[in-house]
UniProtKB/Swiss-Prot annotation:
Subunit structure: Interacts with UQCC1. Forms a complex, named COMB/coordinator of mitochondrial CYTB biogenesis, composed of UQCC1, UQCC2, UQCC4, UQCC5 and UQCC6; stabilizes nascent cytochrome b/MT-CYB and promotes its membrane insertion. Forms a complex, named COMB/coordinator of mitochondrial CYTB biogenesis, composed of UQCC1, UQCC2, UQCC4, UQCC5 and UQCC6; stabilizes nascent cytochrome b/MT-CYB and promotes its membrane insertion. Forms a complex, named COMA, composed of UQCC1, UQCC2 and UQCC4; activates MT-CYB translation.
InterPro entries per the UniProt record, alphabetical: UQCC2 (IPR037698)
Protein name (record): Ubiquinol-cytochrome c reductase complex assembly factor 2
Residue range covered by the transit peptide: 1-13
Localisation per UniProt entry: Mitochondrion matrix, Mitochondrion nucleoid; Mitochondrion; Mitochondrion intermembrane space; Mitochondrion matrix
Domain of life: Eukaryota
Record's keyword terms, sorted: Membrane, Mitochondrion, Mitochondrion inner membrane, Mitochondrion nucleoid, Primary mitochondrial disease, Transit peptide
Statement: the UniProt record of this protein carries the keyword Transit peptide: yes
GO cellular component terms listed in the entry, alphabetical order: mitochondrial inner membrane; mitochondrial intermembrane space; mitochondrial matrix; mitochondrial nucleoid; mitochondrion; nuclear body
UniProt source species: Homo sapiens
Tissue: Pancreas, skeletal muscle, kidney, liver and heart.
Length: 126
């Protein structure tokens, strides 16, 4: 039975897309990591809580198949801000978020980072 659970999770991982713009924050990448941890021995892994494992799979499968999108359809594909899906993807990308963090830093902090000596003592203080 564990082998079939493992194969179902692998199939779900293959179908789940990975968004490269969200490095370290992507659900597809996280899902692959968790499946690798949970099934370390592959098909030979013994599942401690089979009911919880099956429930987790069913929940993820419903998300992947857009079950809730079809169950609760929206009359229009809009958001409160009026931005399009592509604009949201751009804003939520890791690169854009890093740029915003850099912009949010004050001038004094930027100067400190630029001119502060980087020595072994400095690393231990932080």
């Amino acid at each position: 039975m564990a082998a079939s659970r493992y194969r179902r999770f692998l199939k779900l991982c293959e179908e789940w897309p990975v968004d490269e713009t969200k490095r370290g924050r992507d659900l597809g990448a996280y899902l692959r990591q968790r499946v690798a941890q949970a099934f370390r021995e592959g098909e030979n892994t013994q599942v401690a809580e089979p009911e919880a494992c099956d429930q987790m799979y069913e929940s993820l499968a419903r998300l992947h198949s857009n079950y809730y999108k079809h169950k609760y359809p929206r009359p229009r594909d809009t958001s409160f801000s009026g931005l399009s899906l592509e604009e949201y993807k751009l804003i939520l990308s890791t690169d854009t978020l890093e740029e915003l963090k850099e912009i949010d830093k004050g001038m004094w902090k930027k100067l400190q980072e630029k001119f502060a000596p980087k020595g072994p003592e400095e690393d231990h203080k932080a």
